[in-house]
Amino acid sequence: MSTSTFATSCTLLGNVRTTQASQTAVKSPSSLSFFSQVTKVPSLKTSKKLDVSAMAVYKVKLVGPEGEEHEFDAPDDAYILDAAETAGVELPYSCRAGACSTCAGKIESGSVDQSDGSFLDDGQQEEGYVLTCVSYPKSDCVIHTHKEGDLY
């Protein structure tokens, strides 16, 4: 048995897909029979299959330089910049690889995983700076955007 623990504000989205052979009714003069319509392939078995996948979704609030706020849902497997664009929020960016500081922000609350980035040093990350192009949300978070100038 396995156990998973999630943050209390975490939302799980799931996809369930089932596949099974379809059946067709064929009427013969003496009986009504059901036959499975399955392509016959040597050495392959047909069976019901259940695929399940789940992902966590967090609330991300971005606060712009003029105090404007944008809140949207961001899955834990998408960069914050990409999730913002999907939600219709425009943010500055250049490299999309974590190698520059154009998309820099400063996290006020919450946590992110930005292990894909290489531009920010440990001290800047400890001060709360994030690169939205390579940051995955790991909890609900509030990030102040347009912070490239603060890094220098």
Curated annotation (Swiss-Prot):
Targeting signal (transit peptide) range: 1-55
Pfam family, one: Fer2
InterPro entries: 2Fe-2S_ferredoxin-like_sf (IPR036010), 2Fe-2S_ferredoxin-type (IPR001041), 2Fe2S_fd_BS (IPR006058), Beta-grasp_dom_sf (IPR012675), Fd_pln (IPR010241)
Cofactor(s) of this protein: [2Fe-2S] cluster
Cofactor note: Binds 1 [2Fe-2S] cluster.
Predominant location: plastid
Keyword Endoplasmic reticulum attached: no
GO cellular component, one term: chloroplast stroma
Source organism superkingdom: Eukaryota
Domain 2Fe-2S ferredoxin-type: 58-149
Annotated keywords: 2Fe-2S, Chloroplast, Electron transport, Iron, Iron-sulfur, Metal-binding, Plastid, Transit peptide, Transport
Family: Belongs to the 2Fe2S plant-type ferredoxin family.
UniProt cross-references to PANTHER family, sorted A to Z: FERREDOXIN, FERREDOXIN-3, CHLOROPLASTIC
Role according to the record: Ferredoxins are iron-sulfur proteins that transfer electrons in a wide variety of metabolic reactions.
Name under which the protein is recorded: Ferredoxin-3, chloroplastic
